[in-house]
Protein backbone atom coordinates (compact mmCIF):
# COMPACT_ATOMS: atom_id res chain seq x y z
CA UNK A 1 0.00 0.00 0.00
CA UNK A 2 2.77 2.45 0.89
CA UNK A 3 5.79 2.98 -1.29
CA UNK A 4 9.07 3.30 0.55
CA UNK A 5 10.29 6.80 -0.18
CA UNK A 6 11.80 9.49 1.95
CA UNK A 7 12.15 13.21 1.63
CA UNK A 8 13.81 15.73 3.86
CA UNK A 9 11.33 18.13 5.46
CA UNK A 10 11.88 20.76 8.11
CA UNK A 11 9.01 20.99 10.60
CA UNK A 12 8.37 22.78 13.86
CA UNK A 13 7.20 20.34 16.52
CA UNK A 14 6.44 20.60 20.21
CA UNK A 15 9.62 19.44 21.98
CA UNK A 16 7.71 18.26 25.05
CA UNK A 17 5.35 16.11 22.97
CA UNK A 18 8.24 14.65 20.99
CA UNK A 19 10.11 13.87 24.22
CA UNK A 20 7.03 12.17 25.67
CA UNK A 21 6.59 10.00 22.57
CA UNK A 22 10.28 9.11 22.69
CA UNK A 23 10.05 8.21 26.39
CA UNK A 24 6.86 6.16 26.08
CA UNK A 25 8.01 4.16 23.09
CA UNK A 26 11.73 3.96 23.82
CA UNK A 27 12.72 5.98 20.77
CA UNK A 28 16.02 7.80 20.52
CA UNK A 29 15.31 10.43 17.86
CA UNK A 30 12.62 12.96 17.07
CA UNK A 31 12.61 11.60 13.53
CA UNK A 32 11.59 8.19 14.88
CA UNK A 33 8.89 9.82 17.02
CA UNK A 34 7.41 11.68 14.05
CA UNK A 35 7.58 8.54 11.89
CA UNK A 36 5.79 6.50 14.57
CA UNK A 37 3.10 9.15 14.98
CA UNK A 38 2.47 9.36 11.24
CA UNK A 39 2.30 5.59 10.87
CA UNK A 40 -0.13 5.27 13.78
CA UNK A 41 -2.28 8.07 12.41
CA UNK A 42 -2.44 6.61 8.91
CA UNK A 43 -2.55 3.01 10.06
CA UNK A 44 0.33 0.73 9.35
CA UNK A 45 -0.35 -2.66 7.84
CA UNK A 46 -0.56 -5.12 10.71
CA UNK A 47 2.25 -7.61 11.01
CA UNK A 48 1.61 -11.34 11.13
CA UNK A 49 3.06 -11.45 14.66
CA UNK A 50 0.69 -8.73 15.86
CA UNK A 51 -2.33 -10.51 14.41
CA UNK A 52 -1.27 -13.83 15.93
CA UNK A 53 -0.92 -12.05 19.26
CA UNK A 54 -4.62 -11.16 19.12
CA UNK A 55 -5.59 -14.82 19.08
CA UNK A 56 -7.55 -15.74 22.17
CA UNK A 57 -8.14 -12.22 23.49
CA UNK A 58 -11.63 -13.30 24.44
CA UNK A 59 -13.72 -10.95 22.33
CA UNK A 60 -17.37 -11.94 22.24
CA UNK A 61 -19.84 -10.37 19.89
CA UNK A 62 -22.16 -10.84 16.95
CA UNK A 63 -20.39 -10.09 13.68
CA UNK A 64 -23.64 -10.28 11.72
CA UNK A 65 -25.09 -7.59 13.97
CA UNK A 66 -22.00 -5.41 13.51
CA UNK A 67 -22.18 -5.84 9.75
CA UNK A 68 -25.85 -4.89 9.51
CA UNK A 69 -26.99 -1.44 8.48
CA UNK A 70 -29.53 -1.27 11.27
CA UNK A 71 -29.16 1.62 13.72
CA UNK A 72 -29.37 0.76 17.42
UniProtKB/Swiss-Prot annotation:
TM helices/strands, residue ranges: none
Keyword DNA-binding assigned = no
- An annotated Gene Ontology molecular function: toxin sequestering activity
A Pfam family this chain is assigned to? VapB_antitoxin
Keyword list (alphabetical) reads:
Toxin-antitoxin system
Induction info: Induced during infection of mouse macrophages.
Task: Look up the record and give one Gene Ontology term from the biological process aspect.
Answer: detoxification
Role summary: Antitoxin component of a type II toxin-antitoxin (TA) system. Upon expression in E.coli and M.smegmatis neutralizes the effect of cognate toxin VapC11.
Question: What is the protein named?
Answer: Antitoxin VapB11
- Which organism is the protein's source? Mycobacterium tuberculosis (strain ATCC 25618 / H37Rv)
GN (gene name)? vapB11
Amino acid sequence: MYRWCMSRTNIDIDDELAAEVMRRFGLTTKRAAVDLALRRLVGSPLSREFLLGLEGVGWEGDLDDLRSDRPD
